[in-house]
Regions:
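Lectin-like carbohydrate-binding module/patch detector with strong preference for beta-trefoil
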Residues: 30-219
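Secretory targeting and sorting signals
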Residues: 1-32
């Protein structure tokens, strides 16, 4: 069956609209996905309690044995000091810098303030619902597994196991054969300029979003 010129023009216009729509959908899907997180990257970790539980941050010299700095959250990243809210992701199993970080990996989180300190569990916490206190130390393995964290993504896009910026993650401490508890905010912090205290908890989310952390680029 032969089409008239008018029909051929209509078909061509429809095809163009469909192509443009498909292109727009593809671009939108790509834009929605975060950037793949790789080892050696510097990130911010935003707690999700109340939608914004503050950014994981070092704040002042710690009085805990073996610790260097206190750890809590801060309302505005790096507002208290240079790079106090910036954390470098380092493999605890020997994966090379530039390798993709995958859900279930074991990592070190190295704070970039000063000469760099490792996120660490240190001593039993007395706070209600908490397991261990959290601080930063100059030694990456102060105790067996105290400085290692299992990173678990809640989900991602695409669902290929990789961790990306804007993903929500849970961080399980490796102390006691991965029994050190999940990184958690718990009550107001005592340090000047801080928002919430940071401890570990038995639960992924002890409260609404207290154990959930959004991965964000540091710049």
């Amino acid at each position: 069956m032969f089409r008239t010129v008018k029909q051929r023009l209509a078909v061509g216009a429809t095809a163009a609209v469909l192509a443009a729509t498909a292109g727009s959908f593809t671009a939108s899907a790509a834009d929605a996905a975060g950037t793949d997180l790789t080892y050696g990257s510097n990130i911010l970790l935003q707690n999700q309690y109340g939608g914004n539980g503050g950014y994981l941050d070092t704040n002042g010299v710690s009085s805990q044995a073996g610790a260097t700095y206190n750890v809590n959250t801060n309302q505005t990243p790096n507002s208290r000091g240079p790079a106090t809210s910036v954390w470098k992701v380092v493999s605890a199993t020997g994966k090379a810098a530039g390798t993709h970080v995958t859900s279930g990996d074991v990592i070190y989180l190295v704070n970039q303030y000063g000469s760099g300190t490792y996120l660490d569990t240190n001593g039993v916490s007395t706070k209600s619902g908490a397991k261990y206190m959290v601080s930063a130390t100059s030694t990456k393995d102060r105790g067996p597994g105290t400085g290692k964290w299992h990173i678990f993504g809640k989900t991602s896009s695409p669902t290929d196991g990789r961790i990306r910026t804007d993903d929500i993650v849970h961080l399980l401490n490796d102390y006691g054969s991965a029994n050190g508890g999940f990184l958690d905010t718990n009550g107001g912090a005592n340090q000047s300029g801080a928002k919430y205290d940071v401890v570990t908890s038995h639960y992924t989310d002890r409260g609404a979003g207290t154990g959930s952390w959004k991965v964000l680029p540091s710049n």
